[in-house]
């Protein structure tokens, strides 16, 4: 299919969901380009995101839609949604309120390896998760 023919298809027709009906979504800060998180979307969460311009994902652990920030207040306003060349990965460019990570950090990628293979924190703690979500067992 030529590039021009491909652009004639609708965005939703182009997305290749996996055998579970999911597609990975990489989430990036609209202003800085910093990668904030990776989450899964199904068709319903993607349609809701397109309609509301607020990020909505599919929670594999809870098996339900997850409007980012509904319990924490750390919403993601969606500016752009890009699709990769294979159609099987999305990139959401968002304005993030508060931290993206449920551990309280700006990004879920808040740890990096050191030369000795230990890890160090490399991100900003935005909130105390116990204050937002309560004590985790």
From Swiss-Prot:
One Gene Ontology term from the biological process aspect of the record: L-histidine biosynthetic process
Biological pathway: Amino-acid biosynthesis; L-histidine biosynthesis; L-histidine from 5-phospho-alpha-D-ribose 1-diphosphate: step 3/9
Paired cysteines (S-S): none
SUPFAM superfamilies: HisI-like
Gene Ontology, cellular component aspect: cytoplasm
Primary localisation category: cytoplasm
Cofactor section: Mg(2+); Zn(2+)
Pfam families xref list: PRA-CH (PF01502)
Binding locations of Zn(2+): 85, 101, 108
Gene3D superfamilies in alphabetical order: Phosphoribosyl-AMP cyclohydrolase
Protein's cellular compartments: Cytoplasm
Highest taxon in the source lineage: Bacteria
Keyword entries, A-Z: Amino-acid biosynthesis, Cytoplasm, Histidine biosynthesis, Hydrolase, Magnesium, Metal-binding, Zinc
Signal peptide stretch: none
InterPro entries recorded: PRA-CH, PRib_AMP_CycHydrolase_dom, PRib_AMP_CycHydrolase_sf
Cofactor notes: Binds 1 Mg(2+) ion per subunit.
Top-rank EC class of the record's enzyme: hydrolase
Family: Belongs to the PRA-CH family.
Function according to Swiss-Prot or TrEMBL: Catalyzes the hydrolysis of the adenine ring of phosphoribosyl-AMP.
Quaternary structure and partners: Homodimer.
Entry protein name: Phosphoribosyl-AMP cyclohydrolase
Native organism: Prosthecochloris aestuarii (strain DSM 271 / SK 413)
């Amino acid at each position: 299919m030529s590039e021009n023919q491909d652009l004639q298809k609708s965005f939703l027709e182009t997305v290749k969901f996996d055998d579970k009906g999911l597609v990975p979504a990489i989430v990036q800060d609209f202003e800085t380009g910093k990668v904030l998180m990776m989450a899964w979307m199904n068709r319903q969460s993607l349609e809701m995101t397109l309609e509301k311009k607020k990020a909505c994902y599919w929670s594999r652990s809870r098996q339900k839609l997850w409007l980012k920030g509904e319990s924490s207040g750390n919403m993601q306003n969606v500016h752009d949604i890009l699709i990769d060349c294979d159609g099987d990965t999305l990139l959401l460019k968002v304005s993030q309120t508060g931290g993206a990570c449920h551990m309280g950090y700006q990004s879920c990628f808040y740890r990096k390896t050191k030369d000795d293979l230990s890890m160090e924190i490399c991100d900003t703690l935005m909130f105390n998760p116990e204050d937002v979500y309560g004590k985790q067992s």
